[in-house]
């Protein structure tokens, strides 16, 4: 039985839109205002970061990562990426191999869109998080195995101005007892960043089957 990997251009668009939405959430301080609303507290003005001054690091620059990079470049963000193999992508500075620490330290926002492999398992651990900027944010839309969740929880508790936008977890659905639900600097979505649209997926598989 042949195995077909679905490359859905519309999924790429959905993933990119989700990423942009969470970047704007962080960039425009919406999470702070949301938490203030819950407390009935008028927090006052906060100056947002301009696009050109925000460096977004894409961890895993494959098919979907490229969609994110293209959208962010159009909007004048500074886009960098880390990937396993060397590559040239227009308007994206690529980091590889041992340069991962430089990639982490250069990013205001890190978007993890890594696949689940032995090499990516718990790649975002205590050391990784320690090298992220104090007021930065992490978006995970790849696979839950990429994050060592205990390390992330500890980092979030110790750094109130660090934000995490999490669409995937090691075990889903996320248990109601999980500490992630309780943290004010966490936004959780139920694995919806790249929902597969049935009709285009069926058409894609059929086109490959005919070949």
Located regions from the model:
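Active-site regions of enzymes building and remodeling cell-envelope glycoconjugates
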Residues: 1-3, 90-99, 183-188
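Active-site capping/gating segments
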Residues: 6-11, 165-175, 193-199
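Adenosine-phosphate binding glycine-rich loop
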Residues: 174-175, 182-204, 208-209
